[in-house]
Amino acid sequence: PDKLPTGSYFADWALPQARAAIGARYGETIVKTTLDPALQAKAEKILNDFIARDGKVLNITQGALVAMRKDGRVVAMVGGRDYGASQFNRADGARQPGSSFKLFVYLAALQSGMTTTSPILDTPVQVSGYTPKNHEGKYRDREIPLISAFAASSNVAAVRLAHDLGPAKVIKVARQLGVTEKIPDDLTMALGTGSMSLTRLTAAYASIAAGEYPIVPHALDTFQKPKTTAYDPKVLAGMRDLLRSATHRGTGLEAAIDGAYGKTGTTQDYHDAPFVGYVGDLVVGVWVGNDDNSSMNGVVGGGEPAKIWKAFMLSALGRSAAPAVVEDPLDDLGLPLEGEIGPDGLPVTPLTVPADPLPPPPVAPVAPI
């Protein structure tokens, strides 16, 4: 812990917390923060190095990175490439999470009694005029286990789950994990069409590492932990299996290091690309995009963000860049062999069947924001 630094994204984020903790006092007051200067320096350098190297080709002009311990202690926060040029904190600003929102969808499914091997159709679907599509419009055209759908980030599977559960159940899970931002009360939310901060999203993933929720991201050592609820052991084990499948068999292979659990995120027209995950008690979220919301050149969460995440995680953990032990070929999960899977979708069989019309999802009251 250090004195609260000035002129940084972390300082701007921490200052309101410090003022609230100190109260009405006069004179200089020193507060101990959770910031780790060494990890902060690594985060700044790695994020900037990647964007400086690849940004022009990929049309990436901005990025953010937040690292926290599984109890919510924020140890590094990079809200942009240059604080002097722009004080807007992109780690705390709201952007679309894309497929990384599927954490909440699959948690709701597991809490409802489904398991990682429960079948879900990976076929085209249409609900009340809404027709979601997998990446590049390719599908398995059959039932696949939940773990396969999650690893491959099947969009139609996520929408089918949200339809069967009802949007209210998914929203309830997100609220329980600390998401306060507005979430669309329709099936589009299954694909992360709402907006939330990278810090809030990362804290939700931290709850899986911690085994309890909610995890509140905080900047001060004096933070009083709120009452938490432990996950059901079966639900927790299932969610961890899903996250591991993404990093070791699926769209998150670029982030594959031993002990990694995470999920890619990609939004429509490549406006936002996050990757969020953890190793041990270190939970990290990365986002790349543009302030003007212009499209990047095909950047997906399993690409540049996953590479930045891996580079930072290896540096933070003091590991070499030795390749991780990737799981057995994907076809034992009903997925293509390694190397054939694409970003946030299933690049296998082209569309061969018409969309399956479904009735409207069950309606339930949604708690107000």
Language-model-derived ranges and their functions:
Residues 1-37, 41, 73, 175, ...:
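Non-catalytic, structured segments within soluble enzyme domains
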Residues 333-369:
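Proline/serine/threonine-rich low-complexity "mucin-like" segments in extracytoplasmic/periplasmic regions
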